[in-house]
Amino acid sequence: MSSSPVKRQRMESALDQLKQFTTVVADTGDFHAIDEYKPQDATTNPSLILAAAQMPAYQELVEEAIAYGRKLGGSQEDQIKNAIDKLFVLFGAEILKKIPGRVSTEVDARLSFDKDAMVARARRLIELYKEAGISKDRILIKLSSTWEGIQAGKELEEQHGIHCNMTLLFSFAQAVACAEAGVTLISPFVGRILDWHVANTDKKSYEPLEDPGVKSVTKIYNYYKKFSYKTIVMGASFRNTGEIKALAGCDFLTISPKLLGELLQDNAKLVPVLSAKAAQASDLEKIHLDEKSFRWLHNEDQMAVEKLSDGIRKFAADAVKLERMLTERMFNAENGK
């Protein structure tokens, strides 16, 4: 006998409830972890790819990327760079087999202050996806939300029809500049903002709605909706499910497999907290930012300045680790070391 509709409804997981008013995205490079949670989209970053590339399950992809780098030839540096681009695309292509939507693939964080290099690298990634038979409509290119990154996003969207996901976003200034650039999606971070406040203030714990990361994303969401920006707001970097529930109703939320699992086991009732209608009532005023005013406003936010630079360094460090890993596999093995 099937359970009654009332009981079924009561037992609906927080994850299923969340999916009714927010697009759920899986934040992982481990595509075997995606099946269980049935997300719409998925996001990757250099740290996630580095972690996945060290798992036994994914060594075939690593070998394929290495073979590709060798085949293209050139200097050792060129071969490594081509192998890494290919590895990111191979992971993205496998993830796309498991989701109906889009995957985000990140441009090397070491290019975060070079607009033209970011544009070139993004176009290269899209070309590799095309070679794999994947349309650019299923890809979001992730770029750091520096001034240069935001302008690279604007150029990619306007001139090349390449959709961008602006990441490492911590300040209201970054969010406003991204909206004005007309990028497809932003990833304002939640947990890393909380981390900063816990480390740098006397307050060590917060209720979800008072969480500084939650408040930051709420303000950005309300601003975008009040002034009818089309850019999607995708909350990212969560430390607990309380933060996620406090942002229910946000356009998209990208969530790690661990927290997706917790939401799946949670049967508490979930209600939307954010809404476009409520955003209209916010007292936010529209602002315009050129480069000078962007840099000033962003610089006024100590947390955002520190977390953006820290985030770039961390992603860059993991890119270097990935390079070393591939160098070891590609060249030291050849030399019998």
UniProtKB/Swiss-Prot annotation:
Pfam families: TAL_FSA. A motif (Nuclear localization signal) lies at residues 1-10. Keywords: Acetylation, Cytoplasm, Disease variant, Nucleus, Pentose shunt, Phosphoprotein, Schiff base, Transferase. InterPro entries: Aldolase_TIM, TAL/FSA, Transaldolase_1, Transaldolase_AS. The first 10 amino acids are essential for nuclear localization. Homodimer. Heterodimer with isoform 2. Interacts with KPNA1 and KPNA4. Belongs to the transaldolase family. Type 1 subfamily. This is Transaldolase. The lineage of its organism: Eukaryota, Metazoa, Chordata, Craniata, Vertebrata.
